[in-house]
Structure formats: structure tokens, C-alpha cells
């Protein structure tokens, strides 16, 4: 049987668009001679719909479109992820997979393992299914599962949906189908490959895995739909970060040669960020972006990502020099914009600084300058960039990296201003790696931007390392504390100075209020600031 694995890029709540996408790809699968087309988890509404699931009008609209779509599926069978209503005690919905054929629903599988960790909160809305499902089409029998149902190993679940299928079936299965909406983070590709390979070897079953693609708020879904054979060898794979239809034949894949597993590299992170920016703007109705160019590496990489995502003609960059801005920074910003072929403007903030100084002088008389005056500069820049955003309809992209966000080395209502924080989950050392990769074929980012010491240039002779440890020290400590949940003692046991570790941890805690007010940031690590990291602002734990 020829099967199409279709990774789609839905828009949450746009049932008409999502239905049309399913029909378009279904028609392509029919043309290709496929008997079955498989779509991702919650294809019809998009994932994750969050509290839209608590609205009866949302559920009713979903059901109307599902009914209409079902009636139109006559020339091929499809498996599609959708919401299913339920009655009785417990939650009112299932997260289900439907096998539709001949204009009707022939089988359904209800997701049994509901993830409630990091960015996932499915028990808030869904009731877990209680039975495993085997479906049949043209004599071929397959287990039907939804996303987390095949992630039993190492997750602490009490039931194994795949094992339950095999233990209750007296007739052998031909393959296993899993429909997913599995978001990307750096390392996720390798993690998936290990889980899927082990699953297939353990159960001696081929796996057909179909994943959602596209950006949704902070989440980026990478697609990469795959087929693994009973040996645990990947024998077919769709590309990452774009809609695609992968066609496989259930009679041929047992003899298919193994493929090289995809790499999770710096280039992959760049692809993820590019898709995240593109979809965030396009799905929210923005066509253009504006970015403040400091002449530093963070704004340079942000601008490069934006140009890749939107096209340079849709990106405006702005240099906002002050008396503390070096000639090198001004020249590097201009050179970067020329290399990217994007828009470039210069607005001096010196006059605005003078106006602030004069306005505040009666109240500040006799007081020495401190971080207050530095923050005023950042807020002037944020104000001017937001004015350009308002006047011309650009989305302002903020440029701060994860290392700075973690320790509060950023200005609320200043450089934190914006509608999307492109690098807020990218540690500083990874920013450098992205810059190097961008320069692989030609110099996009001026070499001096990469090699000179980072500086905010908010006062004379300022360097980041006047206020922060070197990033090669800071980043590993942040990763250990934020992503691995290591204690201060455990981090010190890795050879880091206790005073440095304690200072970094203190900064993390006291700046929670800043991060709570930050723009939505694109998630590319295992633990990003945002919906997957929930800590109180007011608390007194410093461990």
C-alpha cells in the first residue's frame, strides 16, 4: 500500500484554511497513487490550541469542519488528528486520531499519554484514552497512536500504549502509525531518533511518524516525518522546517536501505529561528520588521535571520548612535545592512538624551550618574523603534540573547521592547556559532563584529565582562542551572567558583519580573523562558 506522510503547517483556529490544506494534499496523494494519507496531531485546529479548547464555539466550529471534511474524503483514506467530544465525568474532550475512508470515520484512537511538563499542559483540557487502537485498511493492520503514546520509555508513565496493542492482538500488525505535534529544540532530533529506533527494535514493528511543521508563538515544529523499519533503522525521511509529502510503500520499506540520520547542528538552529520568525509575522498579519542595529553580534544575527525569513526588502534596520557609540559600531552596522541588502537608517539619540537630562536635572541635582542614565539611552532607542513600528506597520524584533535575559543584563522598556524576541533562548556562545555559520560562504556579518569584545556602549569604555563573567563561564553555569536543574553545590562541583555561581543564581531570581514582561521568544533549547518555565516572581529561594 502506498502511503503519503503529510507534514502540514496549520494556523490555529483557522479551520477553513486547515481543511483546505488537508484537501489539497489529499488530492496530491491521490494523484501519486496513494491509498492512505497521514496528517499530524490536531491537524484541523492546529497545535497547541490552549484555552481555545475551553470555548464551546471553537469546538462547535471544529466539529462542523470535521463533518464537512469527512464527507469529502471519498477517493482515499486519511488519518487526521482532531478533537473528539466526550460525555460523563472527567474532561470533556479527547485528543484523537481518526481514520476516515469512503466519507465516514472508520476508526479512532484516543491519546492515552497526555504530556504535562515543560510547554505541554494537555491534562488541563483532555481526558486520556483508555484503550489502544488497531485499524485496518485494504487488509493491512496498523496500530494507531498519537504523539506521546510512543514516548513511554524514560517518562515515568504507568502504561505503555504500544505494548498494550501488541499484548491484546492475536493477529500480527503490519506497522505502527504515530501522528504528532512535536516541537523542536536543539538536541530533539537525536532524542527522537533514539526513542523511535529503540521502539521499533523492541517491538519488531515498522513506525510511520508524521509531525506538524511551522511556528506557533514560541514553539517551532520541525516536521521531519520519518519511517523506521523493524530493525530500528530509518529508511525514509521528509525534510525539516517546511510542508512536505513523503510517499512510502508498505511492501517495499522492509528491503529499503538505511538512511543517514539527520544532524542537529548550528544550521538546524538557524533553520528553526528562520521559520519561527517567518511564521510569527505572517500568521499575525505582519509583512515587515524593524530592528535596532547596535553594531554588535546579537542585533547582527537577528537582522540576518529576519532577512532570511522575510526577504531583505521587508527588513528595516536602524542605527541609533549616542556619544558613547564608537565609530566602529556605526561602520559595522552600515556594512552589515549593505551585506544583507536590507533597509538602513540612522537616528542620533544625542538630542533626546540632552532633553531627558535637562528635564530630570532639578530632581537629579547633586546625584552622580549611574545605571539610570544608561537605561534612559536604551529606553530612548526602544521608544524610537516603536514609533517606526507604529507609523509604518513593522514588527519590532528585540535582539537580546538568553545569557543576558537570564541575568537581567537588559533594560525593561528599552532593548527589551518588541513583538518577538528572536534570540531570547539562544545562549551567547550559540549566537557566535550562528554568526560563524552565516559567514561560511561569504562574509555577511563583518568579522570585527564577531571578534571584538561585546559591549553595550552605554558609558565610556564599557565592556560586558565589566559586569558579567566571560560567556564561556556564564553559559555553562546557566545551562546547568536552568536546563539541567543542577544545584549550586553541584555546579560548583564542576569546577566553577562558588562566588560566581551564587552571583549568577541570584541574578536569575531577582530578574524574573523582567522576563515576565519580555516579548514572546522563540524556543530552541530544552528549557526556555516562557510558558514551559513557571517560577514565582515573589519568592525567597536562592538554591
Descriptions of predicted regions:
Residues 2, 204, 230, 256-295, ...:
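ATP/NTP-dependent adenylation/nucleotidyl-transfer catalytic domains that generate, transfer
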Residues 1-292, 303-312, 344:
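Enzyme catalytic cores with a strong preference for nitrogen-chemistry domains
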Amino acid at each position: 500500500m502506498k502511503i503519503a506522510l503529510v507534514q502540514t503547517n496549520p494556523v490555529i483556529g483557522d479551520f477553513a484554511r486547515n481543511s483546505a490544506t488537508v484537501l489539497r494534499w489529499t488530492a496530491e496523494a491521490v494523484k501519486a497513487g496513494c491509498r492512505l494519507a497521514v496528517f499530524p496531531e490536531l491537524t484541523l485546529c492546529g497545535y497547541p490550541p490552549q484555552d481555545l479548547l475551553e470555548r464551546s464555539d471553537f469546538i462547535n466550529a471544529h466539529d462542523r469542519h470535521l463533518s464537512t471534511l469527512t464527507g469529502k474524503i471519498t477517493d482515499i483514506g486519511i488519518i487526521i488528528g482532531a478533537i473528539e467530544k466526550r460525555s460523563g465525568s472527567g474532561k470533556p474532550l479527547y485528543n484523537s486520531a481518526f481514520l476516515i475512508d469512503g466519507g465516514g470515520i472508520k476508526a479512532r484512537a484516543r491519546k492515552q499519554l497526555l504530556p504535562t511538563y515543560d510547554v505541554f499542559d494537555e491534562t488541563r483540557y483532555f481526558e486520556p484514552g483508555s484503550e489502544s487502537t488497531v485499524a485496518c485498511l485494504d487488509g493491512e493492520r496498523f496500530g494507531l497512536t498519537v504523539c506521546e503514546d510512543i514516548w513511554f520509555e524514560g517518562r515515568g508513565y504507568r502504561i505503555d500504549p504500544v505494548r498494550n496493542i501488541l499484548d491484546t492482538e492475536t493477529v500480527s500488525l503490519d506497522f505502527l502509525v504515530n501522528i504528532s505535534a512535536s516541537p523542536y529544540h536543539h538536541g530533539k532530533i537525536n532524542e527522537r531518533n533514539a526513542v523511535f529506533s529503540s521502539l521499533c527494535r523492541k517491538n519488531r514493528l515498522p513506525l510511520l511518524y508524521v509531525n506538524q511543521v511551522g511556528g506557533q508563538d514560541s514553539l517551532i515544529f520541525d516536521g521531519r516525518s520519518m519511517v523506521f523499519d523493524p530493525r530500528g533503522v530509518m529508511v525514509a525521511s521528509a525534510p525539516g522546517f517546511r510542508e512536505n509529502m513523503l510517499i512510502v510503500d508498505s511492501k517495499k520499506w522492509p528491503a529499503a536501505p538505511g538512511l543517514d540520520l539527520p544532524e542537529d547542528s548550528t544550521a538546524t538552529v538557524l533553520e528553526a529561528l528562520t521559520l519561527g520568525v517567518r511564521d510569527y509575522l505572517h500568521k499575525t498579519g505582519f509583512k515587515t520588521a524593524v530592528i535596532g542595529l547596535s553594531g554588535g553580534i546579537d542585533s547582527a544575527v537577528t537582522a540576518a535571520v529576519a532577512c532570511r525569513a522575510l526577504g531583505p526588502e521587508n527588513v528595516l534596520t536602524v542605527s541609533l548612535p549616542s556619544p558613547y557609540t564608537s565609530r566602529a559600531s556605526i561602520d559595522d552596522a552600515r556594512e552589515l545592512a549593505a551585506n544583507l541588502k536590507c533597509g538602513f537608517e540612522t537616528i542620533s539619540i544625542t538630542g533626546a538624551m540632552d532633553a531627558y537630562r535637562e528635564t530630570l536635572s532639578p530632581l537629579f541635582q547633586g546625584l552622580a550618574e549611574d545605571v539610570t542614565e544608561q537605561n534612559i539611552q536604551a529606553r530612548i532607542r526602544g521608544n524610537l523603534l516603536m514609533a517606526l513600528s507604529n507609523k509604518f506597520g513593522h514588527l519590532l524584533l528585540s535582539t537580546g540573547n538568553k545569557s543576558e535575559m537570564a541575568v537581567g543584563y537588559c533594560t525593561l522598556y528599552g532593548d527589551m521592547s518588541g513583538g518577538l524576541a528572536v534570540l531570547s533562548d539562544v545562549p551567547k556562545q550559540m549566537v557566535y556559532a550562528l554568526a560563524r555559520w552565516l559567514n561560511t560562504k561569504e562574509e555577511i556579518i563583518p568579522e570585527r563584529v564577531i571578534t571584538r569584545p561585546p559591549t553595550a556602549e552605554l558609558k565610556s569604555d564599557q565592556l560586558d565582562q565589566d559586569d558579567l563573567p566571560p560567556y564561556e563561564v556564564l553559559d555553562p553555569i546557566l545551562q546547568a542551572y536552568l536546563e539541567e536543574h543542577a544545584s549550586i553545590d553541584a555546579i560548583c562541583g564542576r569546577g566553577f567558583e562558588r562566588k560566581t555561581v551564587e552571583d549568577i543564581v541570584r541574578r536569575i531570581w531577582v530578574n524574573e519580573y523582567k522576563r515576565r514582561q519580555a516579548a514572546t521568544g522563540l524556543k530552541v533549547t530544552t528549557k526556555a523562558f516562557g510558558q514551559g518555565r513557571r517560577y514565582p516572581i515573589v519568592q525567597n529561594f536562592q538554591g
